[in-house]
Each structure stands twice: as structure tokens, then as C-alpha cells.
Amino acid sequence: MIAAPTQLAIMPFPNIDPIALSIGPLAIHWYGIAYVAGIMLGWFYARRLARTDRLWPNDTSPISAQHLDDFILWAAGGIVLGGRIGYILFYDMAAVAANPIRAIEIWNGGMSFHGGLIGTTIAMILFARRNGIPVWSMFDIIAAVAPIGLLFGRIANFINGELWGRIADVPWAVVFPTGGPFARHPSQLYEAGLEGLVLVVLLAIAIYVFKALKTPGTVTGIFVCGYALSRIFVEFFREPDAQIGYLAGNWLTMGMVLSTPMFLLGLWAVLRARSATKSA
């Protein structure tokens, strides 16, 4: 058994009530607010990108603001359904098989980013084909704004005191209410910074400085690669899901396994975009 590290300095957990507002029997959770805030701010930024013709191929945006207005419900459905189904398939299949009603108990389990990505991708393909939008351009505009949702979502994970990191003795380690007596890495904030803030800035630079939207698929590839690398890195500090644990040794996690093919897909998307541009 590995001994816990000696902890000389820790940060107190900011004990924020997961329920932001209660109106009678209705409880509004920070997690729900984070989802709504991420979608709405992403929608606002996406509308700005769609209105800026000079960023797109032939200086003409293939996506209108009305398209984005119509896509909000599609995106929400893809995120929630894909995220929940993905969590069940990747992390909680045994428990759901034993108690099927658990599948709809979103509060008793969680959501999977990888599942949400698959669900949103399906929604984007169907929406783009229905509205005559180039699929790669649809992917690009959503990829450009997705880190905003990730930023808010990971902060909400921290407020909820969930998905905490491994035991640590760094000065910024935190004792989480549900994480036992030892201080842990605030891995949710690591993810918020890398998958959220850093990635949205990198994508903005790619779009506004290097005109990445003019080569459809480039922004998508950068996002997918960036997320995958960030997630793999943070997995070294994040506690694996208790019902799965480590898949091999004392280091390989499900998050790493799911993110590795993501990186390869992102790299393929970037190379495909460059090849298509050269042959055009």
C-alpha cells in the first residue's frame, strides 16, 4: 500500500453550496447554470464568427446567425444525451445493468465529455446536411466555442467537489468534502485552465491571426488535438473513477484511453485540411 504524502500546506475547500438558488421545491444547481452559461456564451461568440465574412473561405460565411439560433437545441440535446449515454457505456455500465433506472438519474453518476462530443458531432452532421451547410465548417465554428463550455463545466465540477485529483502535497492542494481526509490536486481547475481558457485563446489566435477558418477542418483538428493532450496530461493528476480505477499499472486511466484516438483524429483533420487546400 502506498503511503499518503506528508502534507505541510493545503488550501481550504471553498464550501460553496452546489445549489445556487431554491424556489420552493425547485433547486437550481451551479452545474446546470454552468451548462446554460457555456452554451449561451458559446452561442454569442459563434454568432460573432458567423457574421465576420472575412474569416471564412471566399470571404463568405457559410453559416448564418439564424442557423446558430436554430442549432442551440440540437447542441443541448447532443451534449446531454451523448454525455449521459457515454458515461454509462464508458464508466458505469455494470451499475446500470444491475439497476436500469440509474440510466436516467443524471444526479447519480455523471456525464462524459467523450460521449457528449460524439452526441454533438452527430447533431452537427444531421443539422448541417439538413440546412445545406458544409459539414467541416459546421464542425469548425462549434469547435471554436466549445472550450467556453468546458471552462464553465470544470469550474462547476470544482464547486460541486467532484472529479477531484490524486492525493498531493503541493501548496495548492485541497481537501474536498467527499475526497477523504487528505488534500488532493484541484484537477478540475487544471482542466478548466487547459481545456478551457488556454484552448479558447489558442483557437482565437488560429482564427484571427492565421485565418484557420479559411481551411475547413483546421480549427476542428486543433481543438480535438488540444483537448486530447490537455486531458491526457491532467489524467496524471486526476483520481480515476472509483468503479473503474486504473486500467493498467498505476497510471493508465479510461480518460487516457479515450483521448488517445481523439488526438489521432484531430491530427488527421489538420493534415486533411492542409492537403485539401493544396489540391484546391
From Swiss-Prot:
This is Phosphatidylglycerol--prolipoprotein diacylglyceryl transferase. The lineage of its organism: Bacteria, Pseudomonadati, Pseudomonadota, Alphaproteobacteria, Hyphomicrobiales. A 1,2-diacyl-sn-glycero-3-phospho-(1'-sn-glycerol) binds at residue 154. One of its GO terms (cellular component) is plasma membrane. InterPro entries: Lgt. Its EC number is 2.5.1.145. PROSITE patterns: LGT. Catalyzes the transfer of the diacylglyceryl group from phosphatidylglycerol to the sulfhydryl group of the N-terminal cysteine of a prolipoprotein, the first step in the formation of mature lipoproteins. It holds the Pfam family LGT. Belongs to the Lgt family. The chain crosses the membrane at residues 26-46, 71-91, 106-126, 132-152, 193-213, 217-237, 251-271. It is found in: Cell inner membrane. GO terms for biological process: lipoprotein biosynthetic process. Keywords: Cell inner membrane, Cell membrane, Membrane, Transferase, Transmembrane, Transmembrane helix. Disulfide bonds: none annotated. It comes from Agrobacterium fabrum (strain C58 / ATCC 33970) (Agrobacterium tumefaciens (strain C58)). Pathway: Protein modification; lipoprotein biosynthesis (diacylglyceryl transfer). One of its GO terms (molecular function) is phosphatidylglycerol-prolipoprotein diacylglyceryl transferase activity.
